[in-house]
């Protein structure tokens, strides 16, 4: 396992987990353990995994987050929760509207810099909640290859929606690349939409986009008429792998 490999290489190790085998291994080896209680799907544990990792790197002096950044992030998320909740009508709920636009379409999510990990989150949430196809692309890398594939098959392009996660904190060159890539996809006949981060700090902006993507994925699942909670395909895969020792 990665835990054992890290110990063999002499790394300092700390376990963050809900218990189980990892906790037992860490305690047997005398390594520190942070245990948190979570019983839902792994994808819903991101506040724990992110918050605990952030606390760890800050305590180690590897990062610094101002209290004002945290408070702004909490405020932005509370506002987003009200705006995007199921109680909010379609006319004033952008997550519901975007989900409707993605119905029966292939989805590709673009982002640059630190927001690339948020694009990955959008992709995996659409996969797991809506049981729908989605991919993500990071810039500038995708400008070296993806744009060359905007010719065929035309029937696929017509049923593709390209989403661009944007931030006022994007590097100027990345912002230029995002705009140019949006235009290229539009000219190719795909659906194009941009989602802009809210807040002033990078932390608030990242979490605002993550929150928005989670709501979009949830509403897309409802539009498809599927239960967003189970991931039967992954359960079957794990079972088949576990059967082979």
Predicted regions and their residues:
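Glycine-rich phosphate-binding loops that contact phosphosugars or nucleotide phosphates
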Residues: 1-80, 100, 167-172, 179-191
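Short helix-capping/linker segments at secondary-structure and domain boundaries
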Residues: 56-66, 130-131, 217-230
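C-terminal active-site/capping subdomain that shapes the small-molecule cofactor and substrate pocket
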Residues: 148-232
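Active-site phosphate/pyrophosphate-binding segments
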Residues: 40, 58-160, 244-245
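Catalytic-loop motifs flanking and including active-site residues across diverse enzymes
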Residues: 45-52, 122, 177, 208, ...
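Structural motif
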Residues: 12-14, 32-34, 106-108, 132-135, ...
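Short, small/acidic-rich helices and loops at N termini and domain boundaries
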Residues: 227-245
């Amino acid at each position: 396992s990665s835990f054992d490999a890290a110990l063999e290489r002499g790394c300092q190790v700390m376990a963050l987990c809900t218990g189980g085998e990892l906790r037992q291994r860490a305690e047997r080896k005398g390594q520190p353990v942070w245990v948190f209680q979570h019983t839902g799907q792994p994808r819903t544990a991101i506040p724990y995994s992110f918050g605990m990792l952030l606390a760890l790197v800050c305590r180690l002096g590897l990062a610094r987050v101002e209290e004002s950044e945290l408070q702004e992030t909490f405020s932005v998320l509370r506002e987003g929760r009200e705006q995007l909740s199921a109680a909010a009508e379609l006319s004033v709920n952008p997550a519901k509207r975007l989900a409707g636009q993605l119905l029966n379409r292939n989805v590709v999510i673009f982002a640059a810099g630190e927001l690339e990990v948020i694009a990955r989150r959008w992709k995996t949430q659409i996969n797991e909640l809506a049981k729908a196809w989605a991919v993500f692309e990071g810039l500038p890398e995708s400008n070296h290859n993806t744009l060359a594939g905007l010719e065929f098959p035309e029937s696929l392009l017509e049923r593709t929606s390209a989403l661009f996660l944007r931030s006022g904190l994007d590097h100027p060159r990345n912002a230029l690349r995002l705009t140019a890539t949006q235009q290229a996809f539009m000219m190719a006949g795909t659906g194009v939409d941009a989602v802009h981060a809210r807040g002033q700090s990078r932390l608030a902006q990242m979490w605002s986009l993550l929150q928005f993507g989670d709501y979009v994925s949830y509403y897309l699942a409802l539009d498809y008429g599927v239960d967003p909670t189970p991931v039967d395909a992954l359960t079957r895969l794990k079972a088949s792998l576990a059967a082979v020792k």
